[in-house]
């Protein structure tokens, strides 16, 4: 949705195709972006490819940008440039029809090139955060005192996100309260862990949220303890919303964050180090202000919407022109 909105704001005619999702279709409708629904099912889905052919025949796109494997594998070839966009270490067999690939992190570029793609067909364009003005959410509405140190964590409740490490750190840091915004298969396990460690009264599981800005603005810091993270959207979101960041040296954050300058970086799975990083930020207002200032500067210099969208548009125009020449020839 973030890219769709940004493209539309730059005058691009956008048409989205997606699985049925009430949240996403509502957002598309509110943004005035037309869309179609299809299944993107498994191997027995014989309907989606024909559906996509009908949609492209009607819409006549210059460029098709696909996200993840299934959309790329189902997309029929046409006189448009077909670009796959990778935000993870997906199987490259699904992207064989693509003219080029966009990766949001340098390590994904390495992965794709080592997987056999020509380096001149693989491009690095990072993500940008969607920054919104918001009133900080009332802590009391989420059963949280106003005067306690509060850490915010966002993401799918999955082992890769290492939210168990954050909960263990909360048991070490005196009176630290934690908001966990996200949903996933680890929820029951994480709730049980918080009870076992005696911190369930200080850990709030918020489920999926659409009010990220209000959550960021209410928190004292953002903690992003991932074990495996190719890019790290939460990093740039924390920077964009002016929230001090504590993270780990997983692949994406270790590339993004300059330790001690725009975030605190700790080793993966090191509970004590994560707890120490949290305490350092909470106890040193001067450092916290420095992290916020430098994070905002990184957004302005490297990860602004204007700069990133311009990279997309320039590349799409280049590939569109190449594809048209091939089709005419």
Please describe what each predicted stretch is:
Residues 1-5, 149-172, 185-192, 272:
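A conserved mid-protein helix/loop that constitutes part of the nucleotide-sugar donor-binding site
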Residues 11-15, 163, 167-204, 283-288:
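A conserved nucleotide-sugar
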Residues 17, 244-247, 257:
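Short hydrophobic beta-strand element within catalytic cores of glycosyltransferases
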Residues 44-48, 65-72, 86-87:
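Short His-centered aromatic/hydrophobic patch
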Residues 47, 113, 119, 128-143:
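Acidic anion/phosphate-binding donor-loop and adjacent secondary structure
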Residues 208, 227:
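Aromatic "clamp/platform" in nucleotide-sugar-dependent glycosyltransferases that forms part
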Residues 259-260, 264-271, 280-286:
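Conserved acidic donor-binding segment of nucleotide-sugar-dependent glycosyltransferases
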Residues 273, 280, 287-302, 308-314:
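A short, well-ordered alpha-helix in the C-terminal region of glycosyltransferases
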């Amino acid at each position: 949705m973030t890219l769709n909105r940004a493209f539309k704001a730059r005058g691009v005619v956008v048409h989205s195709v997606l699985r049925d999702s009430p949240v996403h279709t509502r957002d598309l409708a509110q943004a005035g972006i037309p869309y179609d629904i299809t299944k993107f099912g498994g191997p027995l889905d014989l309907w989606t490819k024909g559906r996509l052919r009908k949609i492209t025949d009607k819409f006549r796109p210059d460029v098709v940008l696909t996200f993840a494997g299934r959309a790329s594998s189902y997309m029929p070839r046409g006189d448009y440039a077909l670009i796959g966009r990778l935000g993870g270490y997906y199987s490259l067999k699904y992207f064989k029809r693509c003219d080029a690939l966009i990766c949001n992190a340098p390590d994904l570029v390495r992965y794709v090139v080592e997987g056999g793609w020509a380096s001149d067909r693989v491009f690095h364009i990072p993500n940008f955060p969607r920054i919104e003005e918001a009133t900080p959410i009332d802590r009391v509405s989420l059963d949280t005192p106003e005067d306690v140190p509060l850490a915010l964590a966002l993401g799918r409740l999955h082992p890769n996100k290492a939210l168990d490490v954050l909960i263990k750190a909360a048991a070490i840091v005196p009176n630290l309260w934690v908001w966990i915004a996200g949903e996933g298969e680890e929820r029951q396990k994480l709730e049980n862990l918080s009870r076992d460690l005696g911190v369930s009264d200080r850990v709030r599981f918020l489920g999926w949220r659409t009010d990220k800005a209000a959550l960021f603005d209410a928190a004292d810091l953002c903690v992003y303890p991932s074990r495996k993270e190719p890019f790290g959207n939460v990093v740039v979101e924390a920077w964009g919303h002016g929230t001090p960041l504590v993270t780990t040296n997983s692949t994406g954050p270790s590339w993004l964050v300059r330790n001690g300058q725009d975030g605190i970086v700790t080793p993966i799975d090191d509970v004590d180090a994560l707890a120490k990083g949290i305490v350092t930020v909470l106890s040193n207002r001067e450092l916290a202000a420095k992290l916020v200032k430098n994070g905002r500067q990184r957004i302005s210099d490297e990860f602004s919407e204007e700069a990133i969208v311009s990279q997309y548009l320039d590349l799409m125009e280049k590939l569109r022109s190449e594809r048209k020449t091939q089709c005419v020839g």
